[in-house]
Amino acid sequence: MKALVTGGEGGIGRAIRARLEREGYEVESLDLATGFDVTDPEAWERVEAVHLAFLNAGITTGQMNLRRLEPEQYRRVVAVNVDGVVLGVLRLVRVMKSGSIVATASLAGLTAIPTDAVYTLSKHAIVGFVRSAAPLVKPIRLNAICPGMTDTTMIDSQRPLFDAVGFPLLEPDEVAEAAWLAATSGRTGECWYVQPGREPAPFRFPNVPGPRRDGEAVGRPPLPSEPPS
């Protein structure tokens, strides 16, 4: 059995790889450190079918002040965090006949995180993409995990604050376990929240109020159907 992990050399990526290897998977790490750029469409064209794929590569702007944010910082975060997922899914659904794809979003994909608005934007994009694309790529399953603050190098600049107030952090192994659960649950189109002290579970999104006509509720609009090719 084969699997791939993007961002496989980071803290969460290494933990996911280790979790998969314990299950007997042959795991390929796709990371800048291994010569793979998730933002490059040509790089994705070299990727072949796997049983499980974890699209985990992600970065932050490192900039809390929008007035100081450079356009290049914005573009880089969107390229890695959003393009790195979308390009991966576009390739994988062409070469996989079944199996499971899990994207690493964040709690920042489920709520507002003012400390990094662009990172939050990118993770909301992943959540929206996964929920919308999942019905279109069956029988491949597509889910996201949305971990809270995790003890990796990404939070190094904030670590003194977390330590000072005793804020609990997730361990990478906990996130990896949630990723495995999302991949093997048999569900699709779900966004699993991961928080310290709680069992991972699909987030329940509130329903959007629907339209009304002549005082009566109207159902969903008809959607065009297109058979998978």
Model-derived features: positions:
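Active-site-adjacent segment of SDR/Rossmann-fold oxidoreductases
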Residues: 95-96, 111, 132-141
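Substrate-binding pocket helix/loop in short-chain dehydrogenase/reductase
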Residues: 64-66, 73-75
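C-terminal helical subdomain
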Residues: 144, 161-210, 226-228
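Residue(s) in the substrate-gating loop at a strand-loop-helix junction
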Residues: 106
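N-terminal Rossmann NAD(P)H-binding glycine-rich loop of SDR-like oxidoreductase domains
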Residues: 9, 17
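Active-site loop immediately N-terminal to the catalytic Tyr-X3-Lys motif
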Residues: 111-118
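Active-site helix of classical SDR
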Residues: 89, 122
